[in-house]
Amino acid sequence: MSSSQNNNSSWIDWFLGIKGNQFLCRVPTDYVQDTFNQMGLEYFSEILDVILKPVIDSSSGLLYGDEKKWYGMIHARYIRSERGLIAMHRKYMRGDFGSCPNISCDRQNTLPVGLSAVWGKSTVKIHCPRCKSNFHPKSDTQLDGAMFGPSFPDIFFSLLPNLTSPLDDPRT
């Protein structure tokens, strides 16, 4: 932890503040603490204590290890909930995830996508809803793609279909 780190910060505050983690949204404490949302995640009681502490304790031995994966998997679940979709919608509308590099997409906003739901398989990509292509993000991020999963853009746009228009068909 840097000496400039606020002593009242939680692990979540610290983690979300790391350069490259701007694609992530804050998962509310009540969502994190709900045991239903923790099902299937290992070491949840120990990690929960670390990520929810008001002060980061670097002597815990867990710092930035299993917490990153655990928070990432909770995040993947959260962004599929109503509150999570609202948070990601806000980020999408602000253009936080970047825009499509395809010139015919006219700087269409993109969404983060994972090529796999399995941790450690690939880093996050950005998905353009107009051309349906995935690209490497311009931002300096090494987030695991499982933090979003391969179905997130489909879920997002099936619930919010008016956010994009398809590419013009040159045959019409």
UniProtKB/Swiss-Prot annotation:
GO molecular function, one term: protein kinase regulator activity
Tissue localization of expression: Probably not expressed in wild-type flies. In males lacking the Y chromosome, it is testis-specific and constitutes the main component of star-shaped crystals.
Stimuli inducing this protein: In wild-type flies, it is strongly down-regulated by double-stranded RNA (dsRNA) interference mediated by Su(Ste) transcripts. In males lacking the Y chromosome, the absence of Su(Ste) locus, relieves such down-regulation, explaining why it is strongly expressed.
Miscellaneous remark of the record: There are multiple copies of the stellate gene in fruit fly, encoding proteins that are extremely similar, which makes their individual characterization difficult. Thus, most experiments probably do not discriminate between the different members.
Family per record: Belongs to the casein kinase 2 subunit beta family.
Subunit relationships: Interacts in vitro with the casein kinase 2 alpha subunit (CkII-alpha). The relevance of such interaction is however unclear in vivo.
PANTHER family hit by this protein: CASEIN KINASE II SUBUNIT BETA
Protein name listed in UniProt: Stellate protein CG33237
